[in-house]
Each structure stands twice: as structure tokens, then as C-alpha cells.
């Protein structure tokens, strides 16, 4: 097993064991919010930790069989040890495949909550409509696989698109599967306003960030500035007479987030804090990823937002993912929420990059 994958597995097992200890700590037990966050993260790591423990046990038993074969005093004893070793290796290969599925997304693949930001790029109104289409594609996909979604903030346009929209998603494997969506998305189609039937190209960017638990990002009120203002609707018109919209500016990083989706200032503040924590955590992840770039350079789950990852060609009903040269002529189904063929191909690609790195 390569050092990077072994390190990820060891770190996750150590984290799981710490969470196990924390769940019996009186201080944690007395804090409902902390206990809930600890139990949620523990549950997300449970399968991986147990499978890795099984993998390590099987590896030890294989080593024992190797020694038994070497020390065998007769043919029967050696054949028995070889047969046992072959059985253990087959069992370990099955466990290893499962571990690959669980670790292919990196150290945050176990996260059950994430924040997604979709922003219109070049292309004016058509780009904003494409951003809306992406938003609807992801929410339909979430509904199909049983994830919960929550709208955090949106800047709608008069034509029904989005300049930008932020949502959270929660469920099993949510970050592992959606992290591959980070990057530049390009659309080629004939806009509704196009009278001569010409195909236009426009773009949007998607950023997917794991949502950290409250105990992981210690954010104090002095760490950020709060600004309150009136919420606005399509075209910028004022839609709220009270200053219910919230803008937060993190002093250390300069990160700015805002939320105006709720009528309540308190609810908007709570949502904005969740997004801010995710953005801060993502910045830390990016800094750590830069240090580990060499170890993970062959994987595509790094989420480089500057990278153009995908083209949606409506006249040809074609989706192309440029990272793995994947082309699917079922764009209508994918836009309707059937994202599985794309997601599974991306995960399998990364899994293949790791498949040969098993411990002997």
C-alpha cells in the first residue's frame, strides 16, 4: 500500500478510536451538541475503521501463513498452510476493494454533509440559466439517492436563473460522490432568446466543500465582522423592509459569505456561519492538499475549481467529462438527475489509480 493511502487509513482509524473514547467522556456526554457531532462523525467512519481493522488482521494472518510455509516439515503441513494463505488473500482482496471505495475521496470521504456553491460564469443570462440547471440537476439527484438538501443563499435573475446559489447536502457518501463536481462546467446550446438557431457557449463554476463539525472549527464572534442589510430579489429590487440579510467577513482569511434566503435575521446568521465554517475548512484543506500534491497527483478528486472539467452539449445530447475522456449521449437523463453513470465512472477511475497499492 502506498504511503499516502496507508497514512489516510491510519489517520482515519486513529480519529475513529479517539471518537470512541470521546463518546464515553463525561464532558462530551454532558454537551448535547458536541455529543451529537461526535456521534455523527463516528458513524461516518464506522465502516471504514472496522474494514481497515479486518484488513490489518488478515495481513497479519497471511504473514503467519508465509512463516508456516517456510517452516513446514512435510508436504501436507506446507499445503495446508498454502491453502489457508490463499483463502486469506482472497478475503483480504474483497476487504481491500471495499476500502478503496471508502477512501477514494481522500481524508474527507466519510463526510456526510457538504456545502455546494454554483456561480454563473461567462455568458450573461444564459450562464445564469445554466447555473439554475446545474442546481436543479444536483437537487434531483439528491432526491433520487435519498440525500437531504437545504438552500442557503441565492441571487436569482429576472429570467429565472441564478448569478450564484449555495446549498447544503446531507447523506451517506455525499462528499465522496459530489467532490468530483468541483470545477468549471461549460454548456453548448441554443438559448431560448436566440432567433437564428445559433449554438452559444457559456459557463458556470461549482465548488463542493465538506461541512466540518462545530467542534472542528472554533469560530468566535471576534473572528468575523457581521453586516446586516435588506434582502433583494431578481434584478436587485428590495424585497424585505427589515435588515434580515447577513454578510460575514472572516478577519484572518478575508473570506466573505452572505445569506438572505430566510426572512429571519437569526436564521440567516446561522446559515451564513455554517457556510463560513465550510469555507474556512476548505481553505485549510487546500493548503494541506498543496503539501500532498505529489502523493495525490494521479487522482482526479482534488477539486481544482480553475479546471474545466465538463461540457454539456445539448444539440448532441452529449456530456463529456474531460478529466477521464468520458462521453455519454444521455445528457437529457443526466440533467434530469440521473448523475450515477458520471459519478460512478469518476470514482472507479480514482479507485483504479489506487488498486495496486496493497500491502503484501
Curated annotation (Swiss-Prot):
Q: Which UniProt keywords apply?
A: Cytoplasm, Methylation, Protein biosynthesis
Instruction: Tell me the domain of life.
Output: Bacteria
Record PTM text: Methylated by PrmC. Methylation increases the termination efficiency of RF1.
Q: Which Gene3D superfamilies match?
A: 3.30.160.20, 3.30.70.1660, 6.10.140.1950
Give residue numbers for the modification (N5-methylglutamine).
237
Its GO CC terms are: cytoplasm
Among its keywords, does the record have Ribonucleoprotein?
no
List, in alphabetical order, the Gene Ontology terms for molecular function in this entry: translation release factor activity, codon specific
Q: What is its main location?
A: cytoplasm
User: Do the record's keywords include Protein biosynthesis?
Assistant: yes
By its UniProt entry, which NCBIfam families does this protein fall under? prfA, PRK00591.1
| HAMAP family in the cross-refs | Rel_fac_1
Q: What does this protein do?
A: Peptide chain release factor 1 directs the termination of translation in response to the peptide chain termination codons UAG and UAA.
Record's family? Belongs to the prokaryotic/mitochondrial release factor family.
Protein name per Swiss-Prot or TrEMBL:
Peptide chain release factor 1
Organism, per UniProt?
Rhodopirellula baltica (strain DSM 10527 / NCIMB 13988 / SH1)
